[in-house]
Design a protein with these regions (language model features):
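ASCE RecA-like P-loop NTPase motor cores
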Residues: 1-170
Length: 170
């Protein structure tokens, strides 16, 4: 299908390694590629992995959901701020959120949840939560690949962390 155009531009922050994708997408190693360094200081990045949990279908049960919720709350309590939490599906996200609701009001962590039928006003209201001054942490539950996975701009302290539940590796 690429032959029909005069040129094609692939734009992504995730197409690494570039040489591999140049071969797969165009077959021509001579294609032009631009490498842009990350604007984020790598020394300020923390990567933590919960090895005792899994998002595999056969392990999806309330015990796993409780462990995942505990990880989310622990992260959000460690430093007050706004966090995005990505889940592999709405069903998985809603299971974890249902458990949170049974705990009663958490004094130090507020949860916001993406719904599957958000209109533009709903999306704006969801993102506005990150701009509000708040007394407690916000953990915003979203779905991987959904409307809040790309193309949002949360600057400075509007977003201080991200958590991914189920990377497909465990």
């Amino acid at each position: 299908c690429l032959e029909k155009g005069v040129s094609t531009i692939f734009f992504s922050a995730t197409l690494l390694p570039v040489q591999y994708y140049k071969e797969v997408l165009s077959g021509n190693q001579e294609e032009y590629a631009v490498y842009v360094p990350s604007p984020f200081d790598a020394s300020r990045r923390l990567l933590a992995v919960g090895r005792d949990v899994s998002s595999r279908y056969k392990r999806r049960n309330s015990r796993e959901y409780w462990k995942i919720l505990n990880y989310i709350l622990t992260a959000a309590r460690a430093r007050k701020g706004n966090y995005l939490v990505y889940f592999p599906s709405y069903a998985y996200m809603n299971e974890v959120y249902s458990l949170y609701q049974t705990m009663g009001e958490q004094q130090d962590v507020e949860i916001a949840v993406q719904s599957g039928n958000m209109k533009e006003d709903d999306r704006e209201a969801f993102l506005e939560k990150f701009r509000e001054k708040r007394e407690r942490s916000l953990a915003a539950f979203c779905v991987m690949g959904g409307i809040f996975s790309e193309g949002i701009d949360l600057k400075g302290e509007q977003l201080i962390g991200g958590l991914v539940v189920g990377t497909g590796l465990a």
